[in-house]
């Protein structure tokens, strides 16, 4: 019988940070990724108008929130504790096509900036999971007859 391996929260955080470092991911890369991605989003014909309606004026708070989000995801810094879904639910005109485009831009940004293939794979895997979760929450409408109602 193998012994169960118990690790403290500090040990798990240290392991995640070591994994990130091995991929070449640190706070500086997260900042680069977020800044470059949202530069592309703002210039995008499909996503730009959605974000322009949601973020008026100073983009810095949103960028900082996204940096905190990814820092918490990758480095376990705990800097993000928000609830992003309600904000997305409040966006008028948001469709599944917007999520597809968001993923395309995110993937292209990763291809252009990621410090390693492992980092690219790690980030896109998480982004796809997040997008799928949001899409289920925003667009899934069960049909009581056993199917799915497509809006």
Where are these regions (language model features)?
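Core of compact, soluble alpha-helical bundle domains
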Residues: 1-151
């Amino acid at each position: 019988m193998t012994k169960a391996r118990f690790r403290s929260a500090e040990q798990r955080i240290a392991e995640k940070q070591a994994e990130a470092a091995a991929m070449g991911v640190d706070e500086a890369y997260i900042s680069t990724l977020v800044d470059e991605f949202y530069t592309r989003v703002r210039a995008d014909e499909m996503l730009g108008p959605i974000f322009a309606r949601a973020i008026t004026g100073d983009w810095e708070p949103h960028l900082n929130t996204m940096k905190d989000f990814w820092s918490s995801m990758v480095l376990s810094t705990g800097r993000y504790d928000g609830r992003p879904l309600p904000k997305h639910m409040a966006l008028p005109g948001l469709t599944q096509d917007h999520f597809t485009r968001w993923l395309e831009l995110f993937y292209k940004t990763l291809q252009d900036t990621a410090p390693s293939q492992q980092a690219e794979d790690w980030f896109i895997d998480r982004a796809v999971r997040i997008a799928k979760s949001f899409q289920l929450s925003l667009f899934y409408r069960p049909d009581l007859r056993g199917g799915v109602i497509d809006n």
